[in-house]
């Protein structure tokens, strides 16, 4: 039983250590009861087992909450380097249960830093064949997340053949979900996002300005606002040739996420716009 509970520990060594120490203390109490022939031996056994399980739940919840808080800080601050450092610290204590989520988040952080090949390598280290047996829905969510991340990275690397392949897998997997399922709504939206992003990067017009304007208005954090600002600026140039409208959006993307890929892309786009303006002949008087 203890091995199974330890398998689902949280992400941090302090909680694993607290669990181990607590288990040792309760085991010591249990052994003492055996040697001292306490009358309440049966009650002590039940309390020891209950204490072990309760401690496992508490430590797992605390570790998961702390990791989720680090993820939210990243989305708010766009400090991918700090989030990556947090993940690397957790990986020292990873197990079969925490490895998939850590690999997905490591891949996300590396992609945000513009390190696409390393992000793909992080996903490959996850090893779907080593993922523990879980419920069918958990495994399906993991597959959906991997397809989404691989498609997103491929788009960033401008490997559109790979992106289309991963999007096809993602669409096929989404079709197997019931329409009212929460995963259906989330990953159907992910498919739309990725399709619009890829089309904008490939220079294929098709209602992207309206889509990303809506995305920018609904973006709940700095990371998504920076991403939506960048793609809205690209869409304005593509569909409306609106350089005046694109410039402040590129600048906003750089200001929101100065250390991330989106800032580098926005900076390159601004430089290209300025070069184009400089190359245009000035109007005569």
Question: How would you label these PLM feature ranges?
Answer:
Residues 29-47:
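Membrane-interfacial hairpin junctions
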Residues 1-23:
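Juxtamembrane interface helix immediately N-terminal to a transmembrane segment
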Residues 40-46, 71-88, 111-129, 159-173, ...:
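Helix-turn-helix repeat elements of alpha-solenoid scaffolds
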Residues 201-285:
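Long, non-transmembrane cytosolic or organellar matrix-exposed soluble domains/tails
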Residues 65-69, 98-108, 112, 142-152, ...:
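"A position-specific structural signal for the A-helix of alpha-solenoid helical repeats
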Residues 149, 155-221:
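Alpha-helical adaptor scaffolds
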Residues 44-74:
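Transmembrane alpha-helices and immediately adjacent membrane-cytoplasm interface residues
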Residues 88-96, 129-140, 173-185, 216-222:
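Flexible helix-coil transition and linker loops at the boundaries of alpha-helical arrays
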